[in-house]
């Protein structure tokens, strides 16, 4: 990696975090290694990844349902407080900003649907549901956006 000017991110305590110029990159293996665990949704996610062109560069993107599943697994494995979790923040962002999310989940494999159904159930039944969602939404649009996020969670709950 160093030949490509990619170096460990010294100021971060995440095992697989590296820096390329000013960009943080997480390299997470598909299989568990001596360095640590993996995320069970990455391998199936990259099998279904599709190419996207950004200028001259082509990258592969995970289907949103599998990316969301990977974020929920990451949150469950290391998050204790959804209000301060970066993984949970990402989950709320995806729920808030991806118009195709529910459709993608409805087309996903049944195991993905069941996993995300549990996620939706857990969030909707959280004793501080409004608070854990609101703290990751724009304060100027929180009233309308929280309704949208809750509606998407209900739709996900109805899929499996």
Regions found by a protein language model. Name each.
Residues 1-160:
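Compositionally biased terminal segments of proteins
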